[in-house]
């Protein structure tokens, strides 16, 4: 047996092990790079991140009117309610409601009282995502429906002056987004 054969015979397993580990390491690096690219592309784009939070000037919203803005691709109703609307919302017995949850991202797990659905203690400002919770249609407002609030013409859901479902197929109240007053005339959504 030649010296080369002896040397190969002594270290054959070591060379084989090295090639095995080198190939496995290269495969792991390649798989990690592919996984990183796949996960990274799922992050929101810059334009989506820019829309994640918006500021809305409500200085021109008169009592009894509403402003609709687009946020995250959905309409958001910002209503400045009248004293009659506030009183009508506060007189409702929770036992009459289909959905007894406030559906308020600012107050999770709160009951659907009028106070838990408005932005201020006086109940003047009501901010809701303007999407019917039945099949995603946009309800009409300004006193529409049988309860003086909003009405979804697609399938007949009626919402009261607090945006709570009162009649129809919608299973939940209109949802309230994360929102806060930055000052007396600016609301931040998101």
From Swiss-Prot:
EC category: translocase
Source organism of the structure: Paracoccus denitrificans
MF (Gene Ontology): 2 iron, 2 sulfur cluster binding; metal ion binding; ubiquinol-cytochrome-c reductase activity
Higher taxonomy: Bacteria, Pseudomonadati, Pseudomonadota, Alphaproteobacteria, Rhodobacterales
InterPro entries (UniProt xref): Rieske_2Fe-2S (IPR017941), Rieske_2Fe-2S_sf (IPR036922), Rieske_Fe-S_prot (IPR014349), Rieske_Fe-S_prot_C (IPR005805), TAT_signal (IPR006311), TAT_signal_bac_arc (IPR019546), Ubiq_cytC_Rdtase_Fe-S_su_TAT (IPR019470), Ubiquinol_cyt_c_Rdtase_Fe-S-su (IPR006317)
Protein name: Ubiquinol-cytochrome c reductase iron-sulfur subunit
Assembly mode: The main subunits of complex b-c1 are: cytochrome b, cytochrome c1 and the Rieske protein.
PANTHER family in the record: CYTOCHROME B-C1 COMPLEX SUBUNIT RIESKE, MITOCHONDRIAL (PTHR10134)
Entry EC no(s): 7.1.1.8
Additional note from the record: The Rieske protein is a high potential 2Fe-2S protein.
Compartment list: Cell membrane
Predominant location: membrane
Domain Rieske positions: 95-188
